Curated annotation (Swiss-Prot):
DNA-binding segment(s): 201-265
Feature: compositional bias, Polar residues: 142-153
The protein, known as: HMG-box protein STE11
Location in or out of the cell: Nucleus
PTM remark: Phosphorylated by MAPK2.
Disulfide bonds: none
Disordered: annotated segments: 142-205, 246-293
Signal peptide: none
GO biological process, one term: regulation of DNA-templated transcription
Originating organism: Pneumocystis carinii
């Protein structure tokens, strides 16, 4: 029986030989009969049966015995119900029986390193007193608590066998449980992006960043480098109205940012020296043909959307200004309207494919100082070259002009709309009509840009021709450093050569 393994010192301290199974308890019961307080010892084994031990009686005065019994009943009742249920769940005790622990210490040894040295003047502490005693002990010994949480036995730093290094480690752990200071939290939240200043406040977005934020979701790719390159090309070819709209949005963003952060000042962070930090420089990514091919497809698709949107906006703008140049002078309205019909008829007849080239193309001027090409496409202004290798100017010009005959209306508009189109009042030297001559006249001016050389060379393999613009005509320069005018009617002899200085 488990009761035989119990050692007693008859003072109140009872310990089991196997402390992990120390579930047996020893209690005393006091019964008052006719002014005499009788005490009986009861042993409560693991199975919950009460075994009565030989009784012995102690005579106590009536008043003193009654007070002692009441104090014990009030102090032990809560401890009896909560303590056994918490520490010994397997123990089933009938609380209706008067079994009260009266020992000076707890009946079961705790495996926790916290040892409570209770005073003999308080034989049966209440639950509140136990909690207050535990809190005071933990506040006085935080190092032992940390050791108990980590699973290691407590170590006395002042004992001869105590290790100073261990105590220092435990103290450090105890200090780490303290709340983090505000300065440390602010350092952890320091900005790591280039768009933030040293104060942690982000800079206001500019017009391009706002444009990128809106267009990023419409690009069907997940590569950030490709997205950046595609949006950069889209931004370069975006319409002026669209760029102005995003510029206004950026201005409102700056005003909002200034109101929200009035004391904000951008302070860029200093770049770390790679030689001192020891980090290797960033490696360049290898070329991926499939990625470049997908990127080019997406770029073409997005640019087509931009060009289509640009052509629609231009069509709306021209629809509002339709025939406004004819109504500028009321007295010349009839003559200008008739000249407009004549030029459309001439251009329609001359733009038919398969017609032989004529050395004397039709030249019709309905506004003083304006000359027009046979198919109403203005000639580009190329930069002057020092030498052009074997260029047949007549055939080359004819090849350039007939290149537009093979274009559809949509391709013709896309080609023309890629360039800036000032109004008629700004430049009268570039007035032209659409290919079929069904819409209102459009003013197109192709500026002096080296990129314009690729416009015609992509359609037909013909060498580029350097042209020198003049007020009256266009002078072609050949490899012999002589030039002559291509348009007949100004000089009767087309072979007349004008020296170029």
């Amino acid at each position: 029986m488990l009761g035989r393994d119990i050692e007693s010192d008859w003072i109140g301290n009872y310990w089991g030989r196997d402390h992990s199974l120390a579930l047996n308890t020893f209690s005393k019961m006091s019964i008052e009969k006719e002014g005499v307080l009788y005490q009986k010892d009861f042993f409560v084994p693991y199975d919950g049966l009460v075994e009565e031990l030989p009784e012995h009686s102690i005579e106590i005065p009536e008043i003193m015995g009654q007070d002692l019994l009441n104090d014990r009943l009030n102090s032990v009742e809560d401890v009896q119900s909560s303590y056994y249920g918490r520490l010994m769940p397997g123990l089933n005790i009938d609380l209706s029986m008067p079994t009260f622990p009266v020992s000076n210490e707890l009946p079961v040894r705790l495996s926790s390193p916290i040892q409570m040295n209770l005073s003999t003047s308080m034989p049966n502490p209440t639950i509140e007193q136990l909690h207050s005693k535990t809190k005071s002990y933990v506040s006085q010994n935080p190092v032992n608590m940390v050791g108990s949480l980590s699973g290691s036995p407590p170590t006395d730093c002042h004992s001869p066998g105590g290790n100073s290094n261990t105590c220092g480690t435990l103290k450090t752990r105890a200090l780490s449980l303290s709340p983090v200071s505000s300065d440390t939290a602010a350092k952890k939240k320091s900005p790591s992006r280039s768009g933030s200043s040293s104060s942690g406040i982000k800079r206001p977005l500019n017009s391009f960043m706002l444009y990128r934020r809106d267009k990023q979701s419409s690009i069907p790719t997940n590569n950030h480098q490709s997205i950046s390159r595609i949006i950069g090309e889209m931004w370069k070819r975006e319409t002026i109205e669209e760029k102005e709209r995003y510029a206004e949005m950026a201005q409102r963003e700056r005003e909002r940012h200034a109101k929200e952060y009035p004391d904000y000042k951008f302070l860029p962070r200093k770049k770390k020296d790679r030689s001192t930090s020891g980090k290797s420089p960033r490696r360049r990514k290898t070329f991926d043909p499939s990625l470049e091919q997908d990127e080019s497809k997406v770029l073409r698709m997005m640019l087509n959307q931009i060009s289509h949107k640009k052509s629609q906006s231009d069509a709306e703008k021209f629809k509002l200004d339709q025939y406004s140049w004819l109504l500028s002078e009321e007295g010349n309205y009839d003559s200008q309207k008739g000249a407009f019909d004549i030029i459309c008829q001439a251009n329609t007849n001359s733009s038919q494919t398969g017609l032989p080239h004529s050395n004397q193309p039709s030249e019709i001027s309905f506004i003083p100082g304006i000359y027009t090409a046979p198919n109403s496409v203005p000639l580009p202004i190329f930069p002057v070259k020092n030498k052009v290798e074997k260029v047949d100017t007549h055939n080359s010009l004819d090849g350039y002009l007939h290149t537009f005959d093979n274009l559809s209306d949509y391709e013709f508009r896309s080609l023309i709309n890629n360039h800036s189109t000032p109004s008629v009042n700004d430049s009268r030297l570039g007035t032209s009509f659409n290919k079929s001559c069904t819409d209102s006249p459009q003013s197109i001016s192709i500026y002096d840009d080296i990129k314009n050389l690729d416009i015609f060379s992509e359609k037909k393999e013909t060498p580029n021709v350097s042209l020198v613009p003049t007020f009256d005509s266009t002078i072609f320069q050949d490899d012999s450093a002589y030039g002559y005018d291509n348009f007949t009617g100004i000089w009767d002899d087309p072979s007349y050569r004008l020296p170029v200085f």
